Each structure stands twice: as C-alpha cells, then as structure tokens.
From Swiss-Prot:
Protein family: Belongs to the thiamine-phosphate synthase family.
Listed EC numbers: 2.5.1.3
Cofactor binding note: Binds 1 Mg(2+) ion per subunit.
Name used for this protein in its record: Thiamine-phosphate synthase
Pathway: Cofactor biosynthesis; thiamine diphosphate biosynthesis; thiamine phosphate from 4-amino-2-methyl-5-diphosphomethylpyrimidine and 4-methyl-5-(2-phosphoethyl)-thiazole: step 1/1
Matching Gene3D superfamilies: Aldolase class I (3.20.20.70)
Keyword Magnesium: yes
Native organism: Chlorobium luteolum (strain DSM 273 / BCRC 81028 / 2530) (Pelodictyon luteolum)
GO molecular function terms listed in the Swiss-Prot or TrEMBL record: magnesium ion binding; thiamine-phosphate diphosphorylase activity
Any Pfam family hit: TMP-TENI
Catalysis performed (reactions): 2-[(2R,5Z)-2-carboxy-4-methylthiazol-5(2H)-ylidene]ethyl phosphate + 4-amino-2-methyl-5-(diphosphooxymethyl)pyrimidine + 2 H(+) = thiamine phosphate + CO2 + diphosphate; 2-(2-carboxy-4-methylthiazol-5-yl)ethyl phosphate + 4-amino-2-methyl-5-(diphosphooxymethyl)pyrimidine + 2 H(+) = thiamine phosphate + CO2 + diphosphate; 4-methyl-5-(2-phosphooxyethyl)-thiazole + 4-amino-2-methyl-5-(diphosphooxymethyl)pyrimidine + H(+) = thiamine phosphate + diphosphate
HAMAP family (UniProt xref): TMP_synthase
Binding site for 2-[(2R,5Z)-2-carboxy-4-methylthiazol-5(2H)-ylidene]ethyl phosphate: T132, G133, S134, G163, I183, S184
Residue sites binding 4-amino-2-methyl-5-(diphosphooxymethyl)pyrimidine per the record: Q35, L36, R37, R38, K39, N67, S106, K135
Length: 212
C-alpha cells in the first residue's frame, strides 16, 4: 500500500449504528476506506455484513477492511484486515495472506509503528491523538506532535485516529499523516454523507495548500 495520492478517510463502523445504512452514505461523501468493526458480532454475522457491504465499496472504489478477524477477511475476499496489539501478529497475518491483501496495525508509539512496518504492515493506525470516548484507552492522548515524529520515521502510510473532528483534522495532514480514521465524527453525524464530505474536503484543502 503506497502513500495514496488522495488523503485516506477511513470510516470505522460502531456498535450502535447500522452499517448497512451508514456505510453507503459515508461512501457517497467520499470515504475511501471502510473498516467493519463489530466486537460483539458472531463470525456468521460479520460474514453477512461484509458480503452486504463489499459491493458498495467496490462500486465506490473504496477499500473494505475487517477489524481483527483475518479469517473473515479471507472468507469474504475483503481488501484486508486491521489488527490490534492483542490480535493475530502482523507477521503471522502476512504469512496467511501473502502479498495480495492489506494489513493495517493499531499502534500507539513510534516503536510499535516501526515494528508493524518491519513485520509487513501496509499502514499504521496511530493514536489516539486526541481524547476520545469511542474506545477505552489506558494511556493519555499522544497529541498531534507525535504524528510528525512517526511520519518521519515510517515508510508506510500513517493513519491518525482518536478524537478527530473537522476542527482538528487538517493539522494532522500537515504533520505528515496520510489520512484519518474516524468513528463518531461520521457515524454519529446527522448526515454521515455530509460529515465525510467535509472531512475529505478539509484534508484535500490542506494538501493542496502544501502543494502535495
């Protein structure tokens, strides 16, 4: 996964919103990566949701990533899997997938991000950058300054996550993030389509202003 020409807007599904309703709206707004994250869902339900959502992503030219479950990603021919620090190791997932699938890794330090890169990750999810209520965290927000350090150290794209809104997204791109991952900023919005469109516009404007 090379550094993309367009900023990455990864919309992660939540437990409270129907992805079958939200995802098509987010895609219409310009989201170019969808991550299916349903911690309480059975394998059967995840397969059902993935098979329903993948056609929307294919039509929109967006990537479809499964959170945690490499087996579901393989079974449904998703574009890839996103792995946390307590999930299947990145190196093992790369052996399982070969070169044809995308592997993302959740990281919260430059060392974790570099390790993920060495082990075959295609991108590093990096955060949480700002305070967030979407997921319980046992450490303080890293702050936007950490983006600069991590982006300078990595060859793979870095996707910032955690408490990101339209008010704070632009500076993260300025500091070297290839994109952002959001949950509530889109899933809880009155219009997921407009929320996604606004976030993508902010990132594109920031990049254009830097001549990249």
């Amino acid at each position: 996964m090379n550094s993309p020409h367009s900023p990455i807007l990864c919309v992660i599904t939540d437990e409270d919103t129907s992805p079958l309703d939200m995802v098509p709206r987010a895609l219409r707004g310009g989201a170019n990566m969808i991550q299916l994250r349903r911690k309480t869902a059975s394998g059967r339900e995840l397969c059902r949701l993935a098979e329903a959502l993948i056609p929307f992503c294919r039509q929109a030219g967006a990537l479809f990533i499964i959170n945690d479950r490499a087996d579901i990603a393989l079974a449904t021919d998703a574009d890839g899997v996103h792995l946390g620090q307590d999930d299947l190791p990145v190196a093992a997932a790369r052996q399982l997938f070969g070169p044809g699938k995308i592997i993302g890794a959740s990281t919260s330090s430059v060392d974790e991000a570099l390790k993920a890169e060495r082990n075959g990750a295609d991108y590093a999810g990096f955060g949480h950058i700002f305070p967030t209520g979407s997921k319980a965290k046992g450490y303080k927000p890293l702050g936007p300054e950490a983006i600069s350090l991590a982006a300078a150290a990595l060859r793979i794209p870095l996707i910032a996550i955690g408490g990101i809104t339209r008010e704070n997204a632009g500076p993260l791109i300025s500091r070297g993030a290839a994109g952002i991952a959001v949950i509530s900023a889109v899933t809880k919005a009155e219009s997921p389509e407009e929320a996604a469109r606004s976030l993508m516009a902010i990132m594109n404007t920031t990049r254009a202003g830097e001549g990249t």
